[in-house]
Amino acid sequence: MSIFTPTNQIRLTNVAVVRARRAGKRFEIACYRNKVMGWRSGAEKDIDEVLQTHTVFVNVSKGQVAKKEDLVRAFGTDDQTEICKVILSKGELQVSDKERQTQLEQMFRDIATIVADKCVNPETKRPYTVILIERAMKDIHYSVKPNKSTKQQALEVIRQLKETMQIERAHMRLRFILPVKEGKKLKEKLKPLIKVIENEDFHDQLEIVCLIDPGCFREIDELIRSETKGKGTLEVLSLKDVEEGDEKLE
């Protein structure tokens, strides 16, 4: 699709239209065809790489620009860039059935790849292959949600797969070095957030090497910072605790 806008007659090519309805009105934005899904998945963060123009239209193909009063009524603002972001995130991408199916298949593969990268079999500590995760997702009839990021959906998939197979997030290995004064008290607060304590050394300071669920990292980091007034240290030894070697579970 190619269009001319009536204001500046700039020719727009490779256009993907995202449409939303608000307050009884239709609003559209012109995007680069291959960038919309990247924005929604979080892979693309530069809005200028996604939008062909920071203009909200009533009809992109005819170049009809939305009226300011309609924008304010529907979105509560006339900031076109912010409105574009809302439409980009929540609107419906206008594509052919074939294009939509291709995009959904790509998102399905991307979700499976994230799950395979982040998870292991808890008994063997071996990672799963992407092919096996794809097969498991099909077995639970997982349906891709085009308006949600692949990372969010990967977390959903992990939760659902736990009901049918041995799978869990690979643990992170951390080292804490804590001042003696706060060490014992802080250790008790950290215990519920720790999966396994692998090593503990208590001399001039308390040093702990442990495994945690990645979802607890931020809470642990904030707890150590606040309780030690910045005197404690937290070191990530490995992002994924997996068995060494090339073997993967098929």
Swiss-Prot record:
Q: Which residues form a coiled coil?
A: none
- What's in the keyword line of the UniProt record? Acetylation, Cytoplasm, Cytoskeleton, Nucleus, Ribosome biogenesis
Write one Pfam family the protein is assigned to.
SBDS_C
- List GO terms (cellular component aspect): cytosol; nucleolus; nucleoplasm; spindle pole
Molecular function GO terms recorded: microtubule binding; ribosome binding; rRNA binding
Nucleus recorded as keyword: yes
Residues the record lists as N-acetylserine modifications: S2
**BP terms from Gene Ontology:** bone marrow development; bone mineralization; cytosolic ribosome assembly; hematopoietic progenitor cell differentiation; leukocyte chemotaxis; mitotic spindle organization; rRNA processing
**Cellular location(s):** Cytoplasm; Nucleus, Nucleolus; Nucleus, Nucleoplasm; Cytoplasm, Cytoskeleton, Spindle
This protein's assembly is summarised as: Associates with the 60S ribosomal subunit.
UniProt family annotation: Belongs to the SDO1/SBDS family.
Role of this protein: Required for the assembly of mature ribosomes and ribosome biogenesis. Together with EFL1, triggers the GTP-dependent release of EIF6 from 60S pre-ribosomes in the cytoplasm, thereby activating ribosomes for translation competence by allowing 80S ribosome assembly and facilitating EIF6 recycling to the nucleus, where it is required for 60S rRNA processing and nuclear export. Required for normal levels of protein synthesis. May play a role in cellular stress resistance. May play a role in cellular response to DNA damage. May play a role in cell proliferation.
What is the protein's name according to its record? Ribosome maturation protein SBDS
The organism named in the record is Gallus gallus
